Amino acid sequence: MKPCLLLLALLLGGCASLDTPRVPSQALPAANSAFGRDLQAQAAAYQGRSGFRLLPNGGEAFRARAELIRNARTSLDLQYYIVHDGLSTRLLVDELLKAADRGVRVRILLDDTTSDGLDDIIATLAAHPHIQIRLFNPLDLGRSTLATRTLGRLFNLNLQHRRMHNKLWLADNSAAIVGGRNLGDEYFGAQQDLNFTDIDMLSVGPVAEQLGHSFDQYWNSALSKPIGEFLSRQPTASDLAETRERLVRSLIAWRQRNAALYQRLADYQYHPRMDTWRRELIWAWNQALWDSPSKVLAQDEPDPRLLLTTQLSPVLTSVHSELMMISAYFVPGQPGLVYLTGRADAGVSVSLLTNSLEATDVPAVHGGYAPYRKALLEHGVKLYELRRQPGDRSGSGPHLFHSGSSKGSDSSLHSKAMIFDRQKAFIGSFNFDPRSVLWNTEVGVLVDSPELAEHVRTLALQGMAPALSYEPRLEAGELVWVTEDNGQIHVLHREPGSWWRRINAWLTKRVGLERML
């Protein structure tokens, strides 16, 4: 196709759209629902503190989302970077539709990368009178084909490479889930080939209202547009009914095809655990942190006043004894290198758990991280790179955080957490890399609780264990990797990882893509 014709196709692909009303809305008061009032009554005894429970297990993280849908009476607000199709997603969509049937207002805000080529399917759900769906930072033109979408993003790369990386699940403005998980089987231990090890956190009380303010800022931003704006025809009630019938049939087929997986995921329907989790809550002071949605509009580096990192800066600079970090995608850049080595030089014990080359799902990011290893190690920063954790068919392979992954599946790190002086812990969507700092928007919660911090620290130490990780060290100025197999310590002089991964990581270094990672 000639350039002029391709440009014409791009323009025509965005012309056939409808003028969809964009009405501002806000989170509904927690007191409007029985569930919200019940949680408010539980929180009242803690005088402004919020309640937290970690969800490091993929099965629990899925169950918590499903149970929050079932408990919701007035509102559900969902904000996600990625939504992948699969059994877990279909079960959650089925529950969301049932919640909408009983009058719950459902607002779903998706980063536009989620909806590439799926506008009609996603919009069909919005045909329900109680479901609203918006896209953040959408591609306005050329959505009709893969070629025109790709060209459209290239024409406006400065804006289109900036994404909403937030992950938030909020029920009745009174209970929320924050953390690193997107939506898809691989995030809930339900994928057959690869699952992500991650950390979420159930958060109830005042913190949920803070996170509700965060959601409202994004929902009402000029960057968030109703899915209907990108359709040539609005889905009807009959379209929705047909979609629901297909959904039910697909769930029946899933149950017949993989009964064990279906029963494991659907167990929330028969054995709810919300009451148990509420008894296990750790009550503590906290601060919900998020980037301003207008961060993505910056022409170059964003205004520091808009950033989550600016809000987190006081605790980053005041750490004095121990800093532990879990960052699946770690690229410190020069500012991060100066910060981490400066803390280590000041006597702070600094340790980091990230993915190894063989485990990462994005080898290019490893290419951005690898050049910093020697400098970090020379200043005493401890590095641990999670090994690819193969699960054999009997399920005996090691799995970090007791993830409950499908038997036979490998595991890769996707977690994002920081522990400061064994006193405070930060859980959210933020990776220690330029993309989280400069380009994408993020959300998380800083909790002031030695008890919770110790729980997160224990998870970090579990991942840093020799049997689960490679520890890079310097021997005569060269990198070696120390690990353990069958109780025996081994020193590797060549970094583990396939030739394809090595080439991918090497190309990233050669091309100089660090600031985009």
Give the location of each predicted region.
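Charged, low-complexity intrinsically disordered terminal segments
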Residues: 15-167, 171-517
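Bacterial N-terminal signal peptides
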Residues: 4-13
